[in-house]
Amino acid sequence: AHGRIQGHYMDGQLDRSSVPGKNLTLGIDIDLQMLGERLLQHKIGAIVAIEPATGEILCMVSSPTFDPHLMIGRQRGKNHRLLQMDKRKPLLNRAIMGAYPPGSTFKTAQALTFLQEEIIHEDYPTFPCAHGFNHKGLHVGCHGHGSPLSLIPAIATSCNSYFCWGLYRMFGDKKYGSPQNAITVWKDHMVSQGFGYRLGTDLPGEQRGLIPNAKFYDKPYRGSWNGLTVISISIGQGEILATPLQIANLGATIANRGHFITPHIVKEIEDNELDSIYRNPRYPTIDREYYEMVVKGMRAAVDGSTGSATCRMAGAILPGVEVCGKTGTAQNRGKDHSVFMGFAPMDNPKIAIAVYVENGGFGATYGVPIGAMMMDQYLHGKLSPENEIRAEEFSNRVILYGDEER
């Protein structure tokens, strides 16, 4: 035990010869992993990158981390207790265990659901945005941009009002018979896209997140609720929770135009085939044609082709690469979380990524530049000289988290 010979158990009656294990090859890109850990220094959050074509996890960063040498030697018990007591929770693998509001990255999944259910189409209807969604005394704020909007500019500008209207129309559509029936259809689409349940990655401890169903709302509201009651879920807030792995997987699904392979760390097992779940594609309940519309919106968020562009910085960091992206600014009791989901290049994509920086503010503040630098490293094998300077600056940025329990 712990490297010390203790003698034979039951005089060796149960002893068995050791069986050598199989050699494993991981899909982790060591340079990408090192860059991610560097960029998240002095911050709390996670980065997950996936190769869309294979589902291989290219990097999985959780910050803060800890020195594994603390877990050996005579002080290992004491060290483990100290790590458990640390308010920053370094033992928590936030990439698969952190359940966060996905914020506006979730609007892409909403768009696909509304398209599939024929609540919206690419060019119509257009929805108004007077600095937010306003209906029957309810206001959900939004930033300034053109109005009214159709789907692609709504994704590019991350318009809250557009997606509030979409959810309100779906949950009030008479074809479903009731909001309860509508949310059941809605949830089934979300689950098929990888939310609400564990994806089944080959690491222990994965959390499922949360996609609410009709019963979730029927109990507190005694069955009397509608789209306005739950409007915040339209923009990835309210009761919606997702892991960074699930958000990255959504990016990979969109990059593939409608399928994903369960994300996995192990690339190869010596003399063995990977389990079929890590080889065979899974198909959401969304028709392939609708993914192209969301791709256009995510591309417009970077290149500004529809006017305002929430991910414009990604284009500046990766000139010449057709990056597709979606920011998220997830509301929180303290400062908002900074989120980014994207993939590159637009056609024949090589990498899909999710970045989540707790209390980092707007998605463009931390999520977008970190995500773009990670894509630069992977696509080109190294950072450009300009991005190397930028990476050093970001690695030295410190987010102060105070003394609150985390």
Label every model-predicted segment.
Residues 4, 11-13, 53-105, 109-363, ...:
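Beta-lactam-recognizing serine transpeptidase/beta-lactamase-like catalytic domain environment
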